[in-house]
Structure formats: C-alpha cells, structure tokens
Amino acid sequence: MTSILYLASQSPRRRELLTQLGVTYELLLADAGEDAEALEAVRPGESPDDYVQRVCALKADAALQRRARRGLPDAPILTSDTTVCRGGDILGKPADARDAAAMLASLSGTTHRVLTAVTVATSAGQRHALSISHVTFRPILAPEIERYVASGEPLGKAGAYGIQGRAAEFVERIDGSYSGIMGLPLFETAALLREAGLHF
C-alpha cells in the first residue's frame, strides 16, 4: 500500500476533486520542453471515445518518463482527459473567443456527451476507466453566449464551458457523473486508485 500519488494535470478542478476524495498528492507537471498540446491532436476518423482514452494514456506515458527523468519515487501517477462531443464531432478547448461562441451555439438546445478518461499508471502497468455523461443545454440566446464568452470562463475548457461555473444556468439536465463532467469522475477514480494500492 502507498499513500503518495502524482497528479499529472494543471487543472485546478481536478486538484479540487482529488482533494475532495481525501487523496494526498504531489503535482507532476510537464517540463518546459514538453509539447503537451501535441498529445491532444485528433487523428483523422478517430471516434471521441477512442480519442479521449488515447490522449489520457499518452499523458500517462509522458508522466512516467517525467517521473523517471526526475528520479522521483515509484508512486502511482494519475492522468485524466475530458472531451465534449456532439454526434461524432470532438469539441476540444476553443482556440479563441470566436471559436468558444461557435461551440456554445452548436450546443444550444441540444444534448451532448462529455467523456472523461482516467488512467492510473504504475511501474506494473496502467489501469483505465471512461466516464460517459449526457448533458442537455436549454436554448441559449446570442447575448447570453456573448456575455459568457466575455467572462473568459469558456477558454481552456473542453466544449467551451465549465459546468461548475456560470454555464450551470444553461444545463437543463445531466445523465451521468457530475464530477466526470468537471474533469475527474470520482467513482471511477477512487476504484482505480484503490486497485493500484493507494491508501486514502
């Protein structure tokens, strides 16, 4: 049993959720020379489910190499990746405000899926889980989209929204994992961590 975990994520939401579980962790962030964004490139014809799981596993591989380079103790590493999809279209992080507005307009009045993959990597191998949730947005008026985008909240978030923030007013219904939609499904994460021998 171990009580140390490395979290390879810059997301403040994932940190909050991991703390909510009562897990003690240390951050294992990318080095300046690592191109973390390159890991998130979508392959032609790749399904959203395959995409999010592949990216999460690649993040785990990169974090294992980082841990070895830094000579850190052999403790489990947690990575996660979230994507929003409408049909087969992957809606990643918006490039800019205009892109964010277009994404939100495409989600207005529809039901979309939020996929969050989780990987726990140890020297013995990797364990994976996938959380799939359905989120229904009410119709969102153009001025509402404009105000929300102007707040800056959509930037840096898959699908151009954070469910725990101002976008909560757009959410008519959720079917699935609220914490998964935020970026770290706690049920699946806790199970993977315990399987990896983490004590919390």
Curated annotation (Swiss-Prot):
Its main location: cytoplasm. One of its GO terms (cellular component) is cytoplasm. The active site is at D81 (proton acceptor). It is found in: Cytoplasm. One of its GO terms (biological process) is nucleotide metabolic process. Coiled coil: none annotated. Its EC number is 3.6.1.9. It catalyses: dTTP + H2O = dTMP + diphosphate + H(+); UTP + H2O = UMP + diphosphate + H(+). NCBIfam families: maf. Nucleoside triphosphate pyrophosphatase that hydrolyzes dTTP and UTP. May have a dual role in cell division arrest and in preventing the incorporation of modified nucleotides into cellular nucleic acids. This is dTTP/UTP pyrophosphatase.
